[in-house]
Amino acid sequence: MSISITHTMITAQDILQFKTHKVSLQESKNCMYNGSPFQVYKQMSSKKKGARFEGIVQEYCTNLGYNVTKPDNSDHDRKINGIKVEIKGSMLWSGRQTHFRWQQLRPAQDYDVVVFLAIFPQQIEFYGASKQDVKDNLEVQDEKGNWIHNQHGGLKVNSGTFFLDSDGLTIPTWFKPMQEVLS
């Protein structure tokens, strides 16, 4: 590898010779969202993605005739027909064509329902769950006492923040159509 290394930078030309960069380029070329109208979201930071997903839910629900308003506090994202709604979106994970992971689910926060977006390359599916269903299905321990959906701090301590995985082919049985939890 013939590059000019300095202590403060790698040039745009030099990065092209790094194995890590080559792997990243290949993964980018193989992204299942390439050419999809949803590709733009795949390229966003998590924070920006979350804000855009909230906007999508707001516009979608408004178009369906729901009354969407600002939240009462930072524990939920919107109020839809007076219901406090937390919004969580997931795109298929790189290299795993059927894997969704919704993150930062906190049953102790002030919301009534969670709206889950499952963003496929050609469609967005909207699901919902009550706060109680989230708690009952995520705030659980296995037979060894491990918090199996715990997002932070390992499996031994309940961090209060959970994740949910789905293979994308079988959405969790406790999910309901979004309209059902908003009525």
Regions found by a protein language model. Give the residues of each.
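Nucleic-acid endonuclease domains
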Residues: M1-N81, K88-S183
